[in-house]
Every structure is written in C-alpha cells, then in structure tokens.
Amino acid sequence: MQRRTFLRLFLAFFGMAFASATEVHAQDAGWQKEIAVFREKRAAGLQKPDGWLSLVGLEWLQPGDTSVGSAPDNKVKLSAVHPAHLGIFHLENNTVTLLPPTDGFPAGLTVGGAPAKQQVLRADADNDQNNPHLLIGTLNLYAIRREDRFALRIKDAHSPSLQKFHGLNWYAPDSAFRVTAKWTPYSPAKTVQLATLVGTSYPAPVPGVAEFALQGKTYRLEPVLEDPKATDLFFILRDTTSATTTYGACRFLYTPFPPNGLDKPGELVLDFNRLQNPPCAYTPYATCPLPPPGNRLPVALAAGEQRYHE
C-alpha cells in the first residue's frame, strides 16, 4: 500500500515537473522565434529603397542658393545618372525654398507627391517625418533641421551600401539579458539635452527611469520619448562592449510602455537581445543622438547587434 502511494506521488511529481519543463521549453522556443523575426525585420528595414543604407549624402545648407544636380556647375554634385540640374535650395531666415534651375525642373520630379514647383520646404526641428520628399528616378531628397542648421538629406535606392549589404552581425540570443525592470515615473517628466554625432543637440522628454539587476548588480537607464505620439520607450545607451564588439558610439533599444502606463510605478521588460545599432553605424550621413551620461553602463551587454562590417 505504501509503495503504491509512493509510486502515485512520484508519478504525479514527475508529471508536474515534466509539464513545467515542457512549458518553459515552449516559452523559450516562442521567445527565440520572436527574436528571429525581429532580426529579419531589422535587416529588411535597412534594405528598403529609402532605408538607412540608401543614404548617399548629407549637405549642410549655407545662406543663399545651393544648386543640386549632376552637372559640374552645381554646388552639390550628384552621380552622372541623375539630372544635370535638379533644383536650387535657397536658405534665408530659417526657411528653405525650392527654386527651379534656369532650364526648369526636370521632367518627373515630384515634391510631396505632386509635380515640382517653387515652394517652401517644411523642415521641422529634429523631426523629419512631415518633411516633403523630392523624388525622381532612384533619388529621394528632403530638407532637415538640426537646431538652427539646415541640411539636404540625399537617398538613392541604388546606393553602393544597399548593393553591398550582406547581413547583420548578432550575438546568439541569451535569455540572461532579458530582464524585468522596475519603472519609476518622473513627476513632472524631466528634459535632457541630447548631443549628436554632428555636434548639435536637442531637448527630449524623459518620463521616468528603469532600474534592473544584471549579474548581481543594479543599474538604471533613462529613456526618452522620440515624439508625442510614441508608444515605445527609446533607450540610447552605451556599455563596455562598445569598445570591442559593438558600435562605439551607442546602441538603441525600443521597448513598449509599462502595462499600467508611464505615470504610475510598475514594471517593464528590457530585452537587450533587441539592442540595435544606430543609423550612424551604417552611414556617415546620419545625425544620431548620443547617450546621456547616466546611460553609459559599466557592464558588458553581450547581446543584440554587433558591429557592422561592409
């Protein structure tokens, strides 16, 4: 009788342990699949015709006229396959105006989806989403503003970087770098001045701080909000791998808001396997923000994206 009871208890315990192990394995397999999908989307995004690998120029505008085209008399020279005279970008009183070249705009040039005409080009400070794009052939141009400086960003769907792309380098997924962090909101939210790689800076709201434990020590990271409609927290950070295997300036991490919102204490998951390089890792023509002092961690985050090599 006692043997039967013991056997039943043993089988019940073994069954629960097996079920628990199966559930953990299923959860791990699901997470691994999520990471694989994330990495596939990451590479696909970079390879879009207007993705970061398509950047071929960043031309800072000086007051007055800046002519653009493939002819040698232009201030900004495009490759020979593009129109000889594309247009003139006139900067005056913090306003960029598109003017036609002497022989008129080239056939097929559109601005914001409409045929090109003389017009003021919108260039919001440190937010390029609403700026109208000039499109012709494989070219994509638009004005950007960084503080009181204006530039012309030039993309080409047939850029050398796109043609040479051979994939990204990643650490193997490691669940040890997927941590639950304590979220503490700031009330009111504070503002940090973010420096950039091109020597400018801009203010960004910091809604709170995430505190987490890793390898027996506690660390803190402050995220910013990229824009008022953001649904993800944006962490700009640097760790000790930046000096060896990852991009030297910083890496980015996007993570959803805490389940109970930004304005209440709570928790959120920081999956450092999703750390990604900033655009500046792939092109010298980006204007990437740098991490605030508190986001430079004295720990090796051997997870996520590694240095990119052409």
Where are the language model's segments positioned?
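Surface-exposed beta-loop interaction hotspot
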Residues: 135-202
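Flexible, glycine-rich surface segments
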Residues: 182-242, 247
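Bacterial N-terminal signal peptides
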Residues: 10-19
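N-terminal pre-domain segments of enzymes
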Residues: 27-59
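Boundary at the C-terminal end of the N-terminal hydrophobic targeting segment
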Residues: 19-26
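Forkhead-associated
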Residues: 55, 60-129, 261
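N-terminal export leaders
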Residues: 3-7
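Extended, aromatic/histidine-rich regions of cofactor-dependent oxidoreductases associated
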Residues: 167-168, 240-242, 266-269, 273-310
